[in-house]
Amino acid sequence: MASQGTKRSYEQMETGGERQNATEIRASVGRMVGGIGRFYIQMCTELKLSDYEGRLIQNSITIERMVLSAFDERRNKYLEEHPSAGKDPKKTGGPIYRRRDGKWMRELTLYDKEEIRRIWRQANNGEDATAGLTHLMIWHSNLNDATYQRTRALVRTGMDPRMCSLMQGSTLPRRSGAAGAAVKGVGTIVMELIRMIKRGINDRNFWRGENGRRTRIAYERMCNILKGKFQTAAQRAIMDQVRESRNPGNAEIEDLIFLARSALILRGSVAHKSCLPACVYGLAVASGYDFEREGYSLVGIDPFRLLQNSQVFSLIRPNENPAHKSQLVWMACHSAAFEDLRVSSFIRGTRVVPRGQLSTRGVQIASNENMETMDSSTLELRSRYWAIRTRSGGNTNQQRASAGQISVQPTFSVQRNLPFERATIMAAFTGNTEGRTSDMRTEIIRMMESARPEDVSFQGRGVFELSDEKATNPIVPSFDMSNEGSYFFGDNAEEYDN
């Protein structure tokens, strides 16, 4: 965590390592994705999948979910203790799609969790390789971020649907560790904290006893993670207040919602990583690529390069647009659900449209959907340029207090202007500046009011040609000033339901 004074790169968090130099980081991240690839190849063999079936993203997701479920200690324990009808706690499985006589068939597969764990460990030199599991969780989370809207969840916790750009990682499981915490948006953590405080208000024993002590530690840890995402002293000071509160209640909820709103202009630092489906790593390993020897980074050219050379397929429903399905998966692969569409379009080399205009539903197929009419098509996941992923909120003034980009949480470190309507945002801050955090609130509002829309974020940063792996010649794009592109405008996506 940033506040503990140990700044580790997110590759280190992802691979659970202590401080390492760049080469060691690249090697350990390479070992992690190589392990995922080896596991995937072995699973395809077990399931007797053809080459084409193994490249189907829906099969990849089923296999990924099986291994995540096999290692979900908490849920496994819960299932053992609360046996439910028709669920074998020792087994895991899902839909596998096969091509038969020119048609796609769905087949439900079941495996012993023990067997899956054995295959996973074997692919990872006998280790549990938690980092690889977290990597898969982040890929699923990025896919959810691009596919679903969280309006209902926002409204339930008293937040505003306009804060959707703060919700990165909102579907990540609790057990996703430091790497998971790094990619969570400000709104996601605020929401977790508010849920906690609400439970404490409704349940007298929530903070009491031995369990309550553990709860309290978790609460303070989450507060520290959130504090570490804020870049201004006033925002951090309010987080200290929230963390030290003896008996967190409505005042703290108020403070947290205020902070979430302020993060629309004073953006927090949220990490972005390109996590790809397991089948992509599998394809590379199968073609003889040695990830550990070559090294790999989640935030540089490597994922772009991997996607340039991978052919992945997807099932397509009758009235879906394959190009739109490709856009959805491309955004998920680069963790770009919250990026400015102008920037994404430039990097991808084809226009990226807002979600409200996509003719495609989610990637996963529900068990009651008719397979008769299913077709499949190639996903176009290639890009025109590549760019470095960022973990800053894109605040302009030396990355400190200033205008970040509204309704956007930047993914790529690429210069852009900040077209935003400050009046709209400031309207959310009328009135309430009293209470014990009043001076900090006033300070935050003052900073937000002085934010200038003509400022530029990531000054001088550009994209790179795919041949420029050392990032020597940045190409700084120029964007149309007037329209900022949020992916969520005119949103009609489905809600995320567990």
UniProtKB/Swiss-Prot annotation:
A motif (Bipartite nuclear localization signal) lies at residues 198-216. GO terms for molecular function: RNA binding; structural molecule activity. Late in virus-infected cells, may be cleaved from a 56-kDa protein to a 53-kDa protein by a cellular caspase. This cleavage might be a marker for the onset of apoptosis in infected cells or have a specific function in virus host interaction. InterPro entries: Flu_NP (IPR002141). It comes from the Viruses. Disulfide bonds: none annotated. Its main location: virion. One of its GO terms (biological process) is symbiont entry into host cell. Residues 1-21, 79-98 are annotated as: Disordered. GO terms for cellular component: helical viral capsid; host cell; host cell nucleus; ribonucleoprotein complex; viral nucleocapsid. A motif (Unconventional nuclear localization signal) lies at residues 1-18. Keywords: Capsid protein, Helical capsid protein, Host nucleus, Host-virus interaction, Ribonucleoprotein, RNA-binding, Viral nucleoprotein, Viral penetration into host nucleus, Virion, Virus entry into host cell. It is found in: Virion; Host nucleus. Residues 79-91 have a biased composition (Basic and acidic residues). Homomultimerizes to form the nucleocapsid. May bind host exportin-1/XPO1. Binds to viral genomic RNA. Protein-RNA contacts are mediated by a combination of electrostatic interactions between positively charged residues and the phosphate backbone and planar interactions between aromatic side chains and bases. Belongs to the influenza viruses nucleoprotein family. Encapsidates the negative strand viral RNA, protecting it from nucleases. The encapsidated genomic RNA is termed the ribonucleoprotein (RNP) and serves as template for transcription and replication. The RNP needs to be localized in the host nucleus to start an infectious cycle, but is too large to diffuse through the nuclear pore complex. NP comprises at least 2 nuclear localization signals that are responsible for the active RNP import into the nucleus through cellular importin alpha/beta pathway. This is Nucleoprotein. It comes from Influenza A virus (strain A/Chicken/Germany/n/1949 H10N7).
